[in-house]
């Protein structure tokens, strides 16, 4: 999956916006911030947007 940067928003497709749901898991050493892509990103919640590695799938083909 390729990523495209439009302004401050990184999308998986040049015509789409992808947002993530935030999940914070606290492990003994340090908190780990996890996020997964979801479609239907609106202008009002676009502050939660995928980073490039999230768009790229991060481990899945």
UniProtKB/Swiss-Prot annotation:
Superkingdom, taxonomy of origin: Eukaryota
Origin species: Naja kaouthia
Similarity remark: Belongs to the three-finger toxin family. Short-chain subfamily.
Location within or outside the cell: Secreted
Further details from the record: Is classified as a P-type cytotoxin, since a proline residue stands at position 28 (Pro-31 in standard classification).
UniProtKB keywords: Disulfide bond, Secreted, Toxin
SUPFAM superfamilies, per database record: Snake toxin-like
Segments crossing the lipid bilayer: none
Short name of any one Pfam family annotated for the protein: Toxin_cobra-type
GO molecular function (one): toxin activity
Tissues in which the protein is found: Expressed by the venom gland.
Disulfide bonds: 3-19, 12-37, 41-49, 50-55
UniProt name for this protein: Nakoroxin
Keyword Mitochondrion: no
Purpose of the protein: Shows no cytotoxicity and does not inhibit the binding of alpha-bungarotoxin to nicotinic acetylcholine receptors of muscle and alpha-7/CHRNA7 types. However, it potentiates the binding of alpha-bungarotoxin to the acetylcholine-binding protein from Lymnaea stagnalis.
A cellular component annotation (GO) from this entry: extracellular region
């Amino acid at each position: 999956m390729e990523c495209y940067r439009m302004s401050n928003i990184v999308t998986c497709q040049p015509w789409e916006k992808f947002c993530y749901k935030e999940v914070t898991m606290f492990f003994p050493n340090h908190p780990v911030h996890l996020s997964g892509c979801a479609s239907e990103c609106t202008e009002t919640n676009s502050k939660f947007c995928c980073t490039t590695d999230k768009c790229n799938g991060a481990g899945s083909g």
